């Protein structure tokens, strides 16, 4: 039974509170555009911004962003703690803090919500995940996403900020499960990308995808996540959307590796830092320590280190002993 729930967004005539977005990258800008359709937005960014919708105020001062109750955190994981330490001085228990990270913080697979609660006084936190692309947010294309949070008011706030007739926002109380599902989907997309470019057919790609979800579920179960979460939007839904045709950087990285590029060149072609690469290494090592089978993560980690070609990687996966599904 699905654990994801949805209700209608706020009525068109209602005025919602100010929303803040931290981070002016592509996804942060897309969040700004989506939120600007429903009310006022303040964007904190260290880079200059242009061509933003009316009702958007850009600031370089985190204190100004803290005027909003709902804060959408779209800062890359490697900069997250320093930004959170600074903004945390201006936050308190009334704030709702929701991140969009697809990364894992350390070798014990801690998620971003752990950092949010450790570095700031916020306790009502959440994650926005699922097949929500820049296109869906920017152009109001039909789509759906999920907010993982133990607090219904967090889900309601995000739904009121970016939800609407074309974007359904579901809720899932399994916060850590949604975070893990989002992070692990990144490494599944890497594997699907190189399988596509090597020339394997739909059957192989389907096998890689479905067994990848099973691998993600094993990791999640070991960390207390609900198995059903991995069948929802944050994992299977995101994977299906990307496999149906996507410009996701993880897919592009997998394709570039399959073309014989060095890991460094492949990363540059795909758009620089991709969190799925570090996720693969951490998951592979975590599996070794815990005795959990992680064949996809193992292969991807070897490929990124240049120890395995894409074709040999897929063959290695397909040559594994089979058992019950």
Regions found by a protein language model. Name each.
Residues 2-60, 66:
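NAD(P)+-binding Rossmann beta1-loop-alpha1 motif at the extreme N-terminus of oxidoreductases
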Residues 2, 13, 189-193, 221-325:
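NAD(P)-dependent Rossmann-like dehydrogenase/reductase catalytic/cofactor-binding core
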Residues 28-32, 62-142, 158-160:
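Rossmann-like NAD(P)(H) cofactor-binding subdomain of soluble oxidoreductases
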């Amino acid at each position: 039974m699905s654990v994801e729930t949805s209700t209608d967004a706020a009525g068109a005539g209602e005025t919602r509170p100010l929303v803040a977005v931290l981070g002016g990258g592509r996804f942060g800008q897309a969040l700004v555009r989506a939120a600007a359709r429903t009310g006022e937005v303040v964007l904190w960014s260290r880079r200059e911004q242009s061509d933003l919708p009316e009702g958007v105020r850009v600031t370089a001062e985190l204190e100004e962003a803290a005027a909003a109750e709902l804060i959408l955190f779209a800062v890359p994981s490697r900069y997250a703690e320093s930004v959170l330490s600074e903004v945390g001085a201006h936050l308190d228990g009334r704030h709702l803090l929701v991140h969009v990270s697809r990364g894992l913080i350390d070798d014990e697979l801690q998620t971003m919500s752990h950092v949010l609660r450790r570095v700031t006084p916020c306790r009502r936190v959440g994650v926005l995940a699922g097949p929500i692309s820049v296109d869906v947010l920017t152009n109001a294309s039909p789509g759906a996403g999920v907010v993982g949070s133990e607090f219904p008011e967090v889900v309601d706030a995000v739904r009121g900020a970016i939800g609407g007739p074309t974007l359904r926002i579901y809720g899932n109380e399994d916060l850590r499960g949604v975070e893990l599902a989002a992070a692990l989907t990144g490494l599944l997309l890497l594997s699907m990308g190189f399988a596509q470019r090597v020339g394997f057919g739909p059957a192989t790609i389907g096998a890689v995808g479905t067994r990848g979800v099973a691998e993600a579920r094993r990791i999640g179960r070991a960390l207390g996540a609900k198995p059903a979460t991995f069948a929802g939007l944050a994992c299977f839904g995101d994977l299906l959307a990307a496999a149906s045709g996507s410009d996701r950087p993880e897919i592009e990285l997998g394709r570039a590796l399959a073309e014989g590029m060095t890991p460094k060149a492949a990363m540059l072609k795909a758009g620089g830092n991709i969190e799925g690469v570090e996720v693969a290494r951490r998951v592979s090592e975590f599996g070794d320590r815990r005795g959990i089978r992680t064949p996809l993560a193992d292969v991807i980690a070897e490929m990124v280190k240049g120890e395995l070609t894409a074709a040999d990687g897929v063959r290695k996966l397909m040559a594994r002993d089979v058992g019950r599904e």
